[in-house]
Amino acid sequence: MKQLTILGSTGSIGNSTLGVVRANPELFKITALVAGRNVHQMAQQCLEFAPRYAAMSDETSAKALRLILAENGSRTEVYSGEKAACELAAIDDVDQVMAAIVGVAGLPSTLAAIRAGKQVLLANKESLITCGKLFMDEVMHSRAQLLPIDSEHNAIFQSLPEKVQSQLGYSSLSDNGVSRIILTGSGGPLRETPLVQFADVTPDQACAHPNWSMGRKISVDSATMMNKGLEYIEARWLFNASAEQVEVILHPQSVIHSMVRYHDGSVLAQMGTPDMRTPIAHAMAYPMRVNSGVAPLDFCKIRELTFAEPDYQRYPCLKLAIDASNAGQAATTALNAANEISVMAFLDSRIRFTDIAVINRMVVEQLSLPEPASVDEVLVIDRKARDAAVQAIAKLNN
C-alpha cells in the first residue's frame, strides 16, 4: 500500500486525487493533507480519510480545524505554515507526494518532496515554469521520480518510450526516435466568440469550460490559452525538448490529450474521457493500471475529432508564453507572476478580459532581469513582476 501526502488537498486536483484513493482503498493510504484556508472542506477530508497529519497555510485556520476535529474525535495532528507543508512533503513513511498547490506558493513544498527523493506527482506547473533547470537538477541529484499530472503531459509521458520515461528531463528525444511532441488544447469556452466581444467577456463566461471541470483561475487561463502556453514551457523542461520539438494545436473535443510523432512517421496519441482522475490514477499506480472511477470512452458517441492551428490574435497569451520560453527563465517567471495577478484582477472584475494579455506583455517587456541561479533569485523576479503587474493594473484603471 502506497502512503500519500497531498499538497493542495482542497483544490480541484486534490479532490480528484482523493477520488482515486476512494476508488482504491486497498492500494493507497493518506498520511498527510496540506491545504490553504478552506477549513470546512479540510475537516471533511480529515474525517473521511483519517490522515496522521494535516496542515493549513495559517495558524488561524489550523486552530479552527483542530476544534472541529476534536469535536468529532479525530486524532489527526494539525500544523500550520510553509515549514509544516515542507516537512509533511518529506515524511519518511510517505511514498508519493501529490504536488498540487497552485502557483509559486507550491514551490517550496514541491522542492522539499524532490529533495527527500519521493515519487512526486507533479501538478504544480510553476515548479518548472519558474525553476525548470534548478528543479530538474534537484530531481537528478536526489534521484526522485517525477510523474506528470497535467492531462497533456501525462498523455505525452504515456506515449513516450520507456527509456525516456525513466530518464525524464534528461533523455534525448531524437536519439529515442521522437521527432515532435504535439500539445493539444480545446481553445477554451471563447473559441468561437467573435473577437469584438472579447472586451465584454465576464468572469463566468471565461470560466465556463466546455469539456473540463477546473478551478476558476485555470479556467481563465484556458480561455486565454495561457494554460497551454505554460504547458508548452513545462513540456520543454519535462521532456528535454527544443522549441522545434514542441507544437501546439487546437483540438476542441479534448478526446486526444496529446500526441508524440516519431521519426518513422508513426504518431502515438493518448485518448480518454476528459477527467483529471485518469492521469492522476495513472501516475499514482505507475507502472500499473488501476480503477480511476472514470467512465470509459465510447467511440460510437464521438461524432468527430477536429484540429486547427491556434490563432495568436485570439490567443495572444499563448504567443507570449512561447516567446518567453525562448527568452529564458527570468521571462517565464515574470510572465507567470504577472498572469496570476492579472487573472485575479479579472476575476474580481477590476480589469477586462482583453487587459490580461496587455498587462502580461507590459510586465515582461518592462522587466529586464538576469537569469536566476537560485530559488531565492526566482522569488525576487516573481515579486518584482507581481509588483509591476499591480502597477500596470492601477494605470489601466486611472
Curated annotation (Swiss-Prot):
Binding-site list for NADPH: T10, G11, S12, I13, G36, R37, N38, N124, E126, G215
Keywords (A to Z) from UniProt: Isoprene biosynthesis, Manganese, Metal-binding, NADP, Oxidoreductase
Entry-linked InterPro entries: DXP_reductoisomerase, DXP_reductoisomerase_C, DXP_reductoisomerase_N, DXPR_C, DXPR_C_sf, NAD(P)-bd_dom_sf
Enzyme Commission designation: 1.1.1.267
Pathway(s) annotated for this protein in UniProt: Isoprenoid biosynthesis; isopentenyl diphosphate biosynthesis via DXP pathway; isopentenyl diphosphate from 1-deoxy-D-xylulose 5-phosphate: step 1/6
Taxonomic superkingdom: Bacteria
A single GO molecular function term of this UniProt record: manganese ion binding
Catalytic activity: 2-C-methyl-D-erythritol 4-phosphate + NADP(+) = 1-deoxy-D-xylulose 5-phosphate + NADPH + H(+)
Any Pfam family: DXP_reductoisom
Residues noted as binding Mn(2+) in the record, renumbered to the chain: D150, E152, E231
Record: residues binding 1-deoxy-D-xylulose 5-phosphate: K125, S151, E152, S186, H209, S222, N227, K228, E231
One biological process term in Gene Ontology: isopentenyl diphosphate biosynthetic process, methylerythritol 4-phosphate pathway involved in terpenoid biosynthetic process
Cofactor(s) named in the record: Mg(2+); Mn(2+)
UniProt xrefs under HAMAP family: DXP_reductoisom
Subunit note: Homodimer.
Family affiliation: Belongs to the DXR family.
Protein function: Catalyzes the NADPH-dependent rearrangement and reduction of 1-deoxy-D-xylulose-5-phosphate (DXP) to 2-C-methyl-D-erythritol 4-phosphate (MEP).
NCBIfam families per UniProt: Dxr, PRK05447.1-1, PRK12464.1
Protein name: 1-deoxy-D-xylulose 5-phosphate reductoisomerase
Species of the source: Yersinia enterocolitica serotype O:8 / biotype 1B (strain NCTC 13174 / 8081)
